[in-house]
């Protein structure tokens, strides 16, 4: 569905119908569809239990927790946080500025500069202290507060009482450091302002990764905290933040948690950014802020905190536990994107993963100038807002919010609050170069001052050390460490690009990449998960017949063509969610996967689930393997990899697929013993071929004729006419065991080859209907060399035999795999052969020169490999099928990127050189097209 063409009532009808179908209420669904004239188009957010169910369950969980505290610890924590916020607001109201604004601004600037230099050291010490010495931390906090009081009398006087309240009100949260100390201590459990490493490391990541659900609870908490006043946020303790992270998963089931999580994620970055004020905006915190805008789309009030200065943002910290989100891969819960979390985490990991930060920038770009202005205004008004409004914010998350950054970065109102910030974020232009940390610091200072002035003018709360939204740019800037600051800044630059977020039935995001910005010196590319639906392309590759583990459900969001990227589901959600990888002209890469419905609504912007894997897949500049999304040579320019269509191809597992030579048809088959031909443009079925008596293991089109052949565990090979569905043309029987693979010769139309479990290879003549040759050499998969057909690659156990087609002599025996080979594939030229085992991929040269030599090698990083295919347009890019995800390997740069794709094992891949499509078949019963 297009982003701009949708109506709320019609979309509701579509999802009600989808819910009825998912509940197997077929008669009711048909009646409702007929009477309500409901569209038959597939829903954009295809949640396993129905989008309405996942949406409703999240809110029900929070509602019931108000009457039954034991129902959900996460929900209870959420409610408790609201109470704490109310207390903090009272404290803030009682507090009065004692120092002039100018003095405060100067003090804040000085403190921030100091914090930039001291945050990391303090974070490390504080992390240890938090775990084992809460009392020591309190003492340190007091000392730091005294120092800060000297510099910022007002801020510190306000903060100690808030801290005391936090300690009293939240026994779990033992202490909250001063604005400086707080972010630092939170670094482990929350978002430490000090260093990205501190934030990422330790508690935050483990919490989120261990508990995808925790992401959702964190999101909800972060959202509330964002609404809180800056002082209020400070009052929250680190302990509370940690608890939120721990409990989030409990509060909501994976799908629900993902919904809350996405909502919280949007708000979280803002709080995190804000709380880093006195502590000095660390690139991590800044990155979070940038990310926040994307999440802010969900909740304007949440967005307000992003722009509003905040001394301490425990909630942000919670959210800031980006590690958690990323642990779950930005697509944390059922595909719900946790932009805030992932982005925060990316900020934390800036040094390690600058690209992560850039993702947050992309989110910011997605906001329109008007939305940005709204966010700024909301922040200004945030202080005056009542606590009761915070309770509504969660609902607001569900409301559609469209936010885009104007060329100036923020809307005009935003410009007022944060002038000059937008300029750094300009969509077309590059942000500040990596080295311009000084510039960023200056911008940051200016923004802080302006924000303070605006707040004072607006009346309401006294000025506080405000991490100030430091709109995307500033956020990135302040890390004492040149590298981190550079990365964050660079990412911020990448951020620069206008974008709009809209909410369709399935949230479709337009993510205008200023991926150009990503070009920035940092060289890190940010990847954003994107979900989309549409036609896809693929070419044949390996298939597997083994059972696949169950996968978690996920919901995809629609994706708009072009440079617009919609958020896909979180990896947790499952392979079902659609995902997309996009590389801007600058070579920046964005990868998105379908996000949960709520996340799609406003925060579809970014899952961050892909962030870890996608980080810099296409970045030539970074050698960091984490930057999996670095530029792939020419691939980096304008390269996109997006799911364009999906179809349930079977009632059981799908094991194989292949394109016709013209790319107009796609064939798939699997455990249901049937082969289905699909029109690739519409993915509508053309023909179903039913004659096999056991599961089909391989399916191949003839290169020159509209014929296709299938092999099966019934020990037969059958040849079919694509235009005649009545019966098979030939049935070849002769194998003594299950036939595992087959292939047509590229030139000799009459020749077909097959292999079986007994390592026997047979040549068949289609015209004569007889077996012409039998020899040993292959048992898993066989593939003829494209174009010339000189060689036949046959995998057997852990080696690949390259046989001469004419003499059947083994020309090369390619050894090097420790485990059995699952798949082999040739590049379109026939010069290179790839072999895949569960732990390794090897690429061999066979065209010219030193044949049989391994020229590229990739080891598994945790997700076992299963199938492979060379990209039809970029020969240096190998697409590898894994469990639930696709691995994109840029061999020339030795960079990899993971893209959530299915909810089961991806057994087969296929490519069409005619259309540029890539097809993936999976045990989740789906066949998807990518381009």
From Swiss-Prot:
Compositional bias segments (type: Low complexity): 149-183, 471-483, 541-561, 573-582
**What are the entry keywords?**
Developmental protein, Differentiation, Flowering, Nucleus, Repeat, Repressor, Transcription, Transcription regulation, WD repeat
Instruction: Please indicate if the UniProt record lists Glycoprotein as a keyword.
Output: no
Q: What induces it?
A: Induced by exposures to biotic stress (e.g. Agrobacterium tumefaciens) and abiotic stress (e.g. hypoxia, cycloheximide, 2,4-dichlorophenoxyacetic acid, AgNO(3) and aminoethoxyvinylglycine). Repressed by exposures to biotic stress (e.g. nematode and Botrytis cinerea) and abiotic stress (e.g. salt, genotoxic, wounding, drought and oxidative stress).
What changes when the gene is disrupted? Slight defects in seed mucilage extrusion. Ectopic expression of AGAMOUS, leading to the replacement of sepals by carpels and stamens and of petals by stamens. Wide and serrated vegetative leaf lamina, narrow cauline leaves, large palisade cells and reduced fertility. In plants lacking both LUG and LUH, embryo lethality and abnormal flowers. Enhance the polarity and growth defects of fil yab3 and luh/+ lug mutant leaves, being partially abaxialized.
Which residue ranges are recorded for the region named Disordered? 149-220, 450-582
Q: What is this protein called?
A: Transcriptional corepressor LEUNIG
Tissues in which the UniProt entry reports expression:
Expressed in young flower primordia, later becomes localized to petals, stamens and carpels. Is also expressed in vegetative tissues. Expressed in roots, stems, leaves, seedlings, apex, flowers, flower organs and seeds.
GO terms in the biological process aspect are: cell differentiation; cellular response to external biotic stimulus; DNA damage response; flower development; galacturonan metabolic process; meristem maintenance; mucilage extrusion from seed coat; mucilage metabolic process involved in seed coat development
Looking at the record's lineage, which domain of life comes first?
Eukaryota
> How does the record describe its quaternary structure?
Forms a corepressor complex with SEU; LUG is the transcription repressor subunit and SEU the specific DNA-binding adapter. Interacts with AGL24-AP1 and SVP-AP1 dimers, and possibly with SEP3, especially when complexed to SEU. Interacts with MED14, HDA19 and CDKE-1. Binds to YAB3, YAB5 and YAB1/FIL; these complexes promote adaxial cell identity in leaves as well as embryonic shoot apical meristem (SAM) initiation and postembryonic SAM maintenance.
Functional description taken from the UniProt entry? Transcription repressor subunit of the SEU-LUG transcriptional corepressor of the C class floral homeotic gene AGAMOUS during the early stages of floral meristem development. Is part of the A class cadastral complex that define the boundaries between the A and C class homeotic genes expression and function. Interacts together with APETALA2 and SEUSS to repress AGAMOUS expression. Also plays a role in ovule and pollen development. Implicated in embryo and floral development.
The residues bearing each WD repeat, given as ranges, are 641-679, 683-721, 726-765, 769-804, 808-845, 852-890, 893-931
Record flagged with keyword Protein transport: no
Subcellular localization(s) per the UniProt record? Nucleus
LisH domain: which residues?
Answer: 8-40
Q: Name one GO cellular component term.
A: nucleus
- Annotated spans, Required for SEU-binding: 1-88
Where composition is biased (Polar residues), the residues are 192-219, 503-521, 529-540
Family matches, as SUPFAM superfamilies: WD40 repeat-like
What lineage is this protein's organism placed in? Answer: Eukaryota, Viridiplantae, Streptophyta, Embryophyta, Tracheophyta
